[in-house]
UniProtKB/Swiss-Prot annotation:
This is Protein RALF-like 29. The keyword Iron does not apply. It comes from the Eukaryota. Residues 1-25 form the signal peptide. Keywords: Disulfide bond, Hormone, Secreted, Signal. The lineage of its organism: Eukaryota, Viridiplantae, Streptophyta, Embryophyta, Tracheophyta.
Amino acid sequence: MIKTKEVTFVTILIVLCVFISTIHAKRYIEYPIRLDLGKGCDPRFPTAACYKRTPANPYRRPCTTANRCRRSTSSTRVPSLKTFVEIPPM
């Protein structure tokens, strides 16, 4: 009885080893692609080059009338600096 169990166990082990060896195992687990990572970046080992760069200070000064910025709704004409400061010829 014990001999039969040993033979059955060894036979099952051999069959399992044959089936396991024929399966093509992957070297690593493939994760779904994340959109915030750059192309070719590994999510397990992200580097600074993988992420989209954002400026340290994204604040921009607003455009004022004194700066004479281009405006689409501006109907008033801003006078130039020469009209405010007229230097008489000497």
